């Protein structure tokens, strides 16, 4: 029973309530499961559940997570990293490897041994409903390089990587969670596109591959999902391509894995050559079916024992021979480390892509001669994009929402007529391009910023053709919005390259480099500053306010050409009439008091004539 149980990796909700724990404990005690796949939850609860299950299991279990873009894909309160499509825009693959190391570090903190990543699907279908942002792009070479860099980073920390979805889910127009998608390409095309990233991954000797619930007639005409096909899993993956690592099924509860009522999906998957049965809908029933299939000679006992031995070998590789429970104290702080924040910011800043820049309008110049407005489509006024734009100039902000009436939309466009430059942030494709927007593009200097899949640009094709500039941020996260705004004003340089083609507009590989011309706004970690040290500033300012050393102030810290701290406190006078803000204007005399004194204090300090604790008086 234990040998059969090692093949099962059941899905687990990270909840510590009695009903959930009883169900999971039953799997541990009755069928001796070899692993668990955690669903959505929070870090501390998942760690507590992990510890309880591992303590109950005689053989330590492999703990896995579907974390394609890090722990935040499943765990709340963790650092949000970009999805693969955005990473596909980054030129520096060494940075992708460093990112893999950071995800691996976080997995180890959580007691996770397997991350079901990277997604090695080549997304060559603009209508793909399930891959899209999960893919590194449409170029199989680039997908290979970035996927391998990510896997190398993961495995350097002791985490087992699992590439997916073999033999390739990138050119499908259906979702295998709901049905059985069909990949209709011939073998030559499969070899040069879909299979190429997996071949490279296998050559480099990584740990695992997930077989997809896909029907690929060129590989097996029996209408079986690839995950249930001996021709795909055994003959192609293991024998022809030489893969010797762990073969995982995709989740067996998915509709793409449905079989005849007389066929058991776990038995079918093992007959095909898979090693680990991932997330079966009925684990105990499937365990019984596998056991009966062995007794009846349908499944070969020696083959099952070989799979069990392979799993135990990888458990050793993952460090389970020296298992330690997860330390829950301080877990959140360890996960959300300064380095994690730096990594998220760095990935976002490196990916922002400029697709069009007529008359080199970007970065925007001569701000004193232009009236600038920001229009948000699909998001409200005052979002992170518009806030960051406002750090560089006085910006009039407008928005159009899904519920905006035709009259409200026209009113917004009428107001925009008096501005010279209009920066339009597109946050959804559910609001179609309007005639008024095309007219604005023809009359004004229109700068687009898309916070969507690249393919969404084609919905705005006519106005894009007339626009002055197009910036692609790929996602609508706060960091993506902030760095897109900085590219527009020159706070950072644009370095990204488009990872997929946008039909009728831009080819994959398009990317216009722009210059850094102004101070940027970055995380302290990006320039080697300790954010904890910056927190002390607030207490120093508060002490000064309490002692009435000043009624208010603004503190700005810049290092290496970027602003890492900018906050305002108090009022202009002791009557508390006008608050100090980031846009407050000071006369030269006010600035010289601080600047002149500071230089004298610095010199006296260097000459050991003065300490920072001394009073000027």
Range-by-range predicted roles:
Residues 1-80, 419, 424, 444:
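N-terminal hydrophobic targeting/anchoring segments and the immediately downstream early-domain regions
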Residues 12-17, 63-73, 113-123, 163-169, ...:
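Short glycine-enriched loops at secondary-structure junctions
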Residues 36, 44-61, 71-73, 138-303, ...:
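Second-shell residues forming the walls of enzyme active-site clefts
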Residues 1-27, 239, 260-530:
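Preference for extracellular/luminal or secreted protein segments
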Residues 617:
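Short helix- or helix-capping micro-motifs
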Residues 526-588, 609-614:
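Short, conserved catalytic-motif segment at the N-terminal edge
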Residues 43-60, 91-111, 299, 304-309, ...:
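Active-site-adjacent structural elements in enzyme catalytic domains
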């Amino acid at each position: 029973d234990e040998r059969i149980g090692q093949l099962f990796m059941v899905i687990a909700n990270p909840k510590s309530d009695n009903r959930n724990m009883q169900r999971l404990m039953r799997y541990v005690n009755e069928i001796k499961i070899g692993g668990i796949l955690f669903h959505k939850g929070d870090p501390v609860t998942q760690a507590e559940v992990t510890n309880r299950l591992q303590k109950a299991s005689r053989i330590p279990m492999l703990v896995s997570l579907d974390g394609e873009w890090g722990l935040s894909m499943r765990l709340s309160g963790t650092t949000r990293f970009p999805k693969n499509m955005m990473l596909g825009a980054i030129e520096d693959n060494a940075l992708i490897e460093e990112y893999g190391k950071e995800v691996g570090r976080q997995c180890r903190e959580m007691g996770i041994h397997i991350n079901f990543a990277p997604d090695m699907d080549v997304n060559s279908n603009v209508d793909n409903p399930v891959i899209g942002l999960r893919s590194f792009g449409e170029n199989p070479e680039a997908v290979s390089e970035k996927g391998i860099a990510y896997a190398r980073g993961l495995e350097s920390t002791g985490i087992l990587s699992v590439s997916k979805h073999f033999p390739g889910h990138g050119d499908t127009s259906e979702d295998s969670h709901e049905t059985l998608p069909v990949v209709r390409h011939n073998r030559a095309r499969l070899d040069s596109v879909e299979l190429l990233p997996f071949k490279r991954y296998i050559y480099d000797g990584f740990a695992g591959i997930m077989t997809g619930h896909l029907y690929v007639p060129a590989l097996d005409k029996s209408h079986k999902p690839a995950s249930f096909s001996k021709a795909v899993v055994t003959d192609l993956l293991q024998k022809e391509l030489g893969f010797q690592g762990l073969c995982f099924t995709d989740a067996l509860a998915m509709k793409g894995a449905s079989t005849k009522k007389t066929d058991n999906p776990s038995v079918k998957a093992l007959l095909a050559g898979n090693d680990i049965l991932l997330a079966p809908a009925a684990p105990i029933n499937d365990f019984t079916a596998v056991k009966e299939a062995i007794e009846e000679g349908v499944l070969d006992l020696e083959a099952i024992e070989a799979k069990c031995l392979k799993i135990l070998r990888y458990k050793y590789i993952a460090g389970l021979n020296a298992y330690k429970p997860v330390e829950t104290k301080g877990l959140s702080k360890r996960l959300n480390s300064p380095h994690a924040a730096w990594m998220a910011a760095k990935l976002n800043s490196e990916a922002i892509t400029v697709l069009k820049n007529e008359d080199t309008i970007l970065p925007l110049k001569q701000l004193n001669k232009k009236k600038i407005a920001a229009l948000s489509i699909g998001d409200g006024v005052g979002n992170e994009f518009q806030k960051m734009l406002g750090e560089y100039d006085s910006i009039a902000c407008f928005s159009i929402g899904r519920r905006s009436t035709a009259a409200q939309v026209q009113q917004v466009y009428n107001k925009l007529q008096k501005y010279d430059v209009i920066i339009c942030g597109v946050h959804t494709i559910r609001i179609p391009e309007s005639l008024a927007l095309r007219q604005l593009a023809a009359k004004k200097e229109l700068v687009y910023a898309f916070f969507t899949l690249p393919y969404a640009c084609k919905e705005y094709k006519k106005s894009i053709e007339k626009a002055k500039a197009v910036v692609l941020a790929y996602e609508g996260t706060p960091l993506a919005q902030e760095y897109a705004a900085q590219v527009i004003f020159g706070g950072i340089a644009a370095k990204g390259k488009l990872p997929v083609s946008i039909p009728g507009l831009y080819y994959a590989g398009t990317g216009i480099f722009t210059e850094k011309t102004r101070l940027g706004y970055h995380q302290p970690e990006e320039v080697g500053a300790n954010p904890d040290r910056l927190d002390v500033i607030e207490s120093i300012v508060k002490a000064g306010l309490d002692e009435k050393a000043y009624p208010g102030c603004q503190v700005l810290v810049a290092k290496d050409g970027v602003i890492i701290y900018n906050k305002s406190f108090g009022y202009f006078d002791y009557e508390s009439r006008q608050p100090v803000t980031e846009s407050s204007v000071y006369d030269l005399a006010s600035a010289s008091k601080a600047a002149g004194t500071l230089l004298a204090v610095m010199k006296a300090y260097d000459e050991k004539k003065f300490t920072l604790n001394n009073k000027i008086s």
